[in-house]
């Protein structure tokens, strides 16, 4: 989820800051990269440290010092298939917004909720129908979700890569309709979201959704095991089966 990368970039120091060079370099780096995506690396989170600087140059007509700085920064870029936890910030019929605390622009398309899920107009919340129960996705509740796709917003950052060719002729009517709905939702999302990084996420698989659902279930299973009184202590235990652009370098 978080990566430490090394970057070389040019920084200008104003004449009035010559006596405070290190702090000025840190301020200029944070000013340039905060809320920005480092292309092919991820969303800037924090400056980690400064490794060194090159020689300073003063250009004609500019009294400031220009120098190359080598530094490390922490970036956020989850990988496809990674499971994260966040908090529901806002819900609507169109989407569920999730926050990680430092990053709030995660939007869940309702078709990626557990099936079947419906929207309660009075509550303004989505819920999952399970065994005739309505399990709500409550605002402020902690949720677990899987990363399906990471995109850069073309309105703010570099255009997202073009999708691979999809053979829609081989799809049945339901799959084709679902595919088209996703395409429309994705296009609308890119127009509305003012974030340089967009995460497409889902909660369809077991173990995803509200964390409280699975926590309560685990607690219930533990109670049942205690009531058994260790009747199966002699059973064999199964073995485990084993998821001037700056120069960028990703650290090991």
UniProtKB/Swiss-Prot annotation:
**What's the superkingdom here?**
Eukaryota
Q: Where in the cell is it found?
A: Nucleus
CDD domains on file:
RNAP_III_Rpc25_N
Which GO terms of type biological process are on file?
transcription initiation at RNA polymerase III promoter
Q: Which SUPFAM superfamilies match?
A: N-terminal, heterodimerisation domain of RBP7 (RpoE), Nucleic acid-binding proteins
Q: What does this protein do?
A: DNA-dependent RNA polymerase catalyzes the transcription of DNA into RNA using the four ribonucleoside triphosphates as substrates.
> Which residues fall in a compositionally biased region of kind Acidic residues?
220-252
| InterPro entries attached to this UniProt entry | NA-bd_OB-fold, RNA_pol_III_Rbc25, RNA_pol_Rpb7-like_N_sf, Rpb7-like, Rpb7-like_N
Alphabetical GO CC annotations of the entry are: RNA polymerase III complex
> What is an example of a Pfam family matching this protein?
RNA_pol_Rbc25
The protein's assembly and partners:
Component of the RNA polymerase III (Pol III) complex consisting of several subunits.
Tell me which UniProt keywords the record has, alphabetically: DNA-directed RNA polymerase, Nucleus, Transcription
Name one molecular function that GO assigns to this entry. Answer: DNA-directed RNA polymerase activity
The Swiss-Prot or TrEMBL record describes its family as follows:
Belongs to the eukaryotic RPB7/RPC8 RNA polymerase subunit family.
Q: What is the lineage of its organism?
A: Eukaryota, Amoebozoa, Evosea, Eumycetozoa, Dictyostelia
Return the protein name. Answer: DNA-directed RNA polymerase III subunit rpc8
Q: Where is this region: Disordered?
A: 214-252
């Amino acid at each position: 989820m978080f990566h430490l990368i090394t970057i070389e970039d040019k920084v200008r120091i104003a004449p009035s800051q010559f006596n405070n060079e290190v702090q000025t370099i840190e301020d200029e780096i944070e000013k340039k990269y905060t809320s920005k995506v480092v292309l092919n690396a991820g969303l800037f989170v924090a400056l980690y440290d400064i490794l060194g600087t090159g020689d300073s140059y003063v250009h004609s007509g500019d009294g400031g010092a220009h120098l190359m700085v080598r530094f490390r920064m922490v970036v956020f870029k989850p990988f496809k298939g990674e499971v994260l936890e966040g908090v529901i910030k806002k819900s609507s019929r169109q989407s569920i917004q999730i926050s990680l605390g430092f990053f709030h622009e995660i939007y869940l398309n309702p078709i990626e909720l557990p099936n079947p899920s419906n929207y309660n107009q009075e509550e303004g919340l989505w819920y999952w129908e399970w065994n005739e129960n309505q399990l709500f996705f409550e605002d402020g509740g902690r949720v677990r979700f899987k990363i399906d796709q990471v995109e850069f917003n073309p309105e703010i950052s570099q255009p997202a890569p073009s999708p691979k060719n999809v053979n829609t002729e081989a799809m049945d009517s339901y799959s084709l309709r679902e595919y088209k709905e996703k395409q429309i939702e994705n296009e609308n999302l890119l127009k509305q979201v003012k974030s340089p990084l967009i995460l497409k996420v889902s909660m369809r698989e077991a173990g995803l959704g509200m964390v409280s659902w699975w926590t309560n279930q685990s607690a219930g299973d533990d109670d049942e095991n205690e009531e058994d009184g260790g009747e199966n202590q002699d059973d064999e235990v199964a073995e485990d089966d084993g998821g001037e652009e700056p120069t960028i370098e990703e650290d090991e």
